[in-house]
Amino acid sequence: MSKVYSWRKLNEKELTRVYLDEMRRDFPPTELKPLSMILNSEADGTAHTWGVFDGETLAAYLLMVRPAGSRVSQLDYFAVLPEYRSAGLGAQLLADLPQHERGAQAILIEAECPDKAEDETMAVRRLGFYARCGAPV
């Protein structure tokens, strides 16, 4: 039986910590929006961030963008923390995401184009991961 992780939306303090401690490690500076922009989007309701927890410990985060009235949620940032990687958690979370994004008819995954990415190898790996999870790329 696979481990059960709990999902909940992060508050401003938690999101700030995730940005400073995790996102700056997980994404190159050219891909990372300023924290103030992310917090403003959360405050005005156009974005929210899921924290996925193993007990009380953060295992992954997914930052979603969905403007009011939109039926499409966009996966803007997604990362599994290093100690939880390579165990299938990322694929499990992508499969579970639609049940958490209530009201969305589709989920759009944003990913860097390899020829324009700062880190081409990472961009290719990301696209490969999404393709293995069943996303059309």
Task: Give a label for each model feature.
Residues 1-37, 53:
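Short amphipathic alpha-helix that is part of the acyltransferase structural core
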Residues 9, 58, 136-137:
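Residue-level detector of beta-propeller blades
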Residues 80, 86-101:
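Conserved acetyl-CoA-binding loop-helix of GNAT-fold acetyltransferases
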Residues 101-122:
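Conserved GNAT acetyl-CoA-binding A-motif
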Residues 128-137:
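Conserved acetyl-CoA-binding loop of GNAT-fold acetyltransferases
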